[in-house]
């Protein structure tokens, strides 16, 4: 049974600001093999969710350079996983963070922005780490930055992925036993 727990936005932002200008040794650096931006965005979302989906090909996980899901490092695959694109949702069981497309005004700290170039390719993932009035501030790797104004980037379009929550799996039998014994409701997130 899947239940939804809140996304910890403040943790995603704290992680982004701590690691944007250096590489966390727990993760490979993809800067020389296509870019590190979505790897970094995934790390930030992981900091706010602490759940991975280990489904081969259609999940969202990182174990090592050689053992990771395409959605961990690929801009389009990340989008497909987070927005539960039909090709992903039907194959990965739904565990993990999930997002919806929102306007720039509705985007919040800890959300992810993806940029499209003039030729139509989505090429960059950034994490929203601040707002100054109407200005969105982002942190990212591959051109490492902290709190850079989004308006200073040159891009044709942007999409804003609002992380709605995190789906986790709860064992139905365990749920029943806890409820029967009068314990805490296991379908409710424990903070």
For the regions a protein language model found, what residue spans apply to each?
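Low-complexity, Gly/Ser/Thr/Pro-rich intrinsically disordered linker/tail segments
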Residues: 137-142, 150-191
């Amino acid at each position: 049974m899947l239940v939804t727990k809140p996304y910890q936005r403040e943790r995603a932002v704290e992680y982004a600001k701590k690691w944007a200008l250096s590489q966390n040794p727990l993760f490979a650096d993809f800067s020389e093999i296509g870019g590190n931006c979505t790897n970094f965005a995934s790390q930030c979302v992981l900091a706010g969710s602490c759940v991975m989906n280990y489904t081969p090909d259609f999940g969202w996980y990182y174990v090592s350079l050689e053992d990771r899901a395409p959605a961990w490092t690929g801009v389009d695959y990340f989008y497909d996983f987070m927005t539960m694109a039909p090709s992903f949702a039907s194959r990965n069981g739904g565990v993990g963070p999930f997002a919806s497309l929102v306007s720039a005004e509705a985007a919040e700290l800890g959300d992810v922005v993806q940029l499209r170039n003039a030729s139509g390719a989505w090429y960059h993932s950034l994490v929203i780490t601040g707002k100054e009035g109407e200005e969105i501030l982002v942190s990212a790797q591959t051109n490492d930055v902290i709190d850079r104004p989004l308006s200073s980037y040159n891009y044709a379009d942007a999409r804003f992925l609002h992380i709605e929550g995190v789906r986790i799996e709860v064992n139905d039998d365990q749920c029943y036993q806890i409820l029967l014994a009068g314990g805490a409701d296991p379908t409710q997130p424990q903070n």
